[in-house]
Amino acid sequence: QISRVTDLPTIVDADTGFDSCAKTISTFEQKGLAGCHIEDQIAEKRCGHLDNKELIIKEEMVKKIKQSVESRKDKNFLIIVRTDANTVEGIDKTLDRIKAYEDAGADMIFPEAMKDEKEFEKVRKISKVFLLANMTEFGKSKLLNKTELENLGYNLVIYPVTTQRL
């Protein structure tokens, strides 16, 4: 409904892609959305800044990404891939997943719950695509401002709970 009342690009959270990434992408394109992000958690997902998350295996996520990319009809529709690996597997496995997700066709990477500037920087050093940062006031990431994230090479930042505090 948001995309019906604005000309601004609208990106939505597609959780784990629902039952079919192909159907999800097709539906979102038909509704006029600019993109979506899908994540590598199991279907019974949790907030990215909570503990006890479970991930699907990297190869399964790669298949979801390829399915999403192949089903996309509008080359400008952004396929953003979120990884929750940092708090589950650590930064090295996160970087490994990011490389695989980019190779599968992700347009933008959303590395969830990076602890500090060093981790954000490590992601930027290995990533070849656009990057999204999530700055939630009550999360695991150190709060960085737009300029700090821009200087770290991040292209988009979201503040998901800020408006709830106003």
Range-by-range predicted roles:
Residues 1-159, 165:
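Alpha/beta enzyme core
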